[in-house]
Amino acid sequence: VLELAENQTSLLTSAYFDQTYNSQPTYIAKKGYSMGMMYGYMYEGTYKYEDFYKSGDTYVLRPGVPYFSSENNTQPGMPKYKDLNGDGIIDTNDRTMIGRGLPIHTGGFTNDFEYKGFDLSIFFQWSYGNDVLNANRLFFENVNNSRNLNQYATYADRWTPENPTSNIPVAKNSSSNKVVSSRVIEDGSFLRLKTLTLGY
């Protein structure tokens, strides 16, 4: 991005794939960076028991452990995000670039082989250095009471009291579970065999 509107250094854009996320910026255009930069929170796993002390039957976050601003009652197993500005509160000021939509490099190559009347033609194609926002994981590795959806098999490994080291959030409908974060950003690089032709 070389230039935006006058006195503008960045532009936020939402991805309109679901009403839960319509109001959240998912992409950012920023001067000096490539287009298609993904925007959200840096995921740090789930809150573990050691992040809390117990007061009776209640889990209370230890001093210095940041909490999500719109959560009234942070509990073990809930999503944990990086407090980028260090104020102890996870809020919109802690969102940042979390993925790169455009590849650093793309290409392909083809080659032909002949042997005793046989001929073989191959074409490989690649993309390197780009990320993918896997929005499916926002819905199929995530409990949201407004939907009745089957979940991915990986969701069986979510945080539970019997599985307290998991970094897949607990089955709980919470505001911290409804944000775009680096948890769903995946490496989009690939090398694929696009065509293969064998003749005689």
Region locations from a protein language model:
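Low-complexity, intrinsically disordered short peptide segments enriched in small/polar/basic residues
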Residues: P25, D57, N111, T165-N167
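Extracytoplasmic gating/loop element in the C-terminal half of outer-membrane beta-barrel translocons
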Residues: P76, S127-Y200
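Outer-membrane beta-barrel domain signature
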Residues: T96-R100, V184-D187
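Flexible glycine/proline-enriched surface loops and loop-helix/loop-strand junctions
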Residues: P103-I104, S181
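Conserved small-residue
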Residues: V1-G99
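Secondary-structure capping and boundary motifs in well-ordered enzyme cores
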Residues: I89, P103, S189-F190
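Transmembrane beta-barrel strand/turn architecture of Gram-negative outer membrane proteins
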Residues: V1-Y43, H105-N142, L196, Y200
